[in-house]
Amino acid sequence: MSIGILGKKLGMSQLFDKDGNAVPVTLIEAGPCRVTQLKTQPLDGYTAIQIGYGVSKDKHLSKPEKGHLLKSGEILLKHLKEYRVEENSSYEIGKEITVTNFEVGQKVDISGKSMGRGFSGYQKRHGFSRGPMSHGSKNHRAPGSTGAGTTPGRIYPGKRMAGRYGGKKITTKGLLVVKIDDQKNLLVVKGSVPGKPGSIVNIKPNNVVGNKGGAKS
C-alpha cells in the first residue's frame, strides 16, 4: 500500500470542463500531515508509516500520547493513521506530508464516517415500498411479514429491519483528482465523499488488485 493523507471535508461545489459541462466536486483540506512513527519488520513485525493530522489541545492528551507525539516535533496532533508500506527508508520522523503527494488525473479511495441519521424506518433505511395510503389501510409504513412460518419459527439473522442508519465507515473508490492547490492544501475530487462538512477523511491512492502504483513519495 502507498502512503495516503488525512484531511477535512469542506463541502461540495462544481467546476466546468472545457465543454462547459458542470462537474460536481468535493473540496478537501488535505494535510499537512506529519510522520509520527516508523514501524519496521525487525521491531514491529511489519513495515508501516504513521502520520498525524490536526492540532490537539494539551489537556485532551495523556502523558504517553504527548510523549509519543513530541518525538515528531512540538505540535500535538489530534488524528493518527497508519499505512503499511514495503519500505519506509525515504521517510523520517517529523517529515511533512502534503497534498503534493497526489497529482491531477490520479484516482483515489476516500474513507470517512457516513452522516448519522439516527433510528430510521424501513423506507428511509432500506428503500422499501410503503403500503396503500387510503381505503382503510392500516399498513402505511409497516414492514409486512418478516418471517417464514412454523419452520423455521424465527426471523433469520441479517433481516433488513428498522434501526440505526448511518454513522459507519464508508469508502468511496476510484474518485478522480481534478484540481490541486498546494498553497491552500486543497484537494478537489470529482463526485461525493462520505461524511458531513468538517468531518475527517482518509485519502489514499486507488487500490487496484495487481496494481502497485500510487502516490509519489
From Swiss-Prot:
Source organism, top-level taxon: Bacteria
**GO CC terms of this entry:** cytosolic large ribosomal subunit
GO terms of biological process kind: translation
Annotated signal sequence is none
- For bias kind Low complexity, which ranges apply? 142-153
Q: What Gene3D superfamilies does its record include?
A: 3.30.160.810, Translation factors
The record ties this protein, via PANTHER family, to: 50S RIBOSOMAL PROTEIN L3 (PTHR11229), LARGE RIBOSOMAL SUBUNIT PROTEIN UL3C (PTHR11229:SF16)
Listed name of the protein: Large ribosomal subunit protein uL3
- Its source organism is Prochlorococcus marinus subsp. pastoris (strain CCMP1986 / NIES-2087 / MED4)
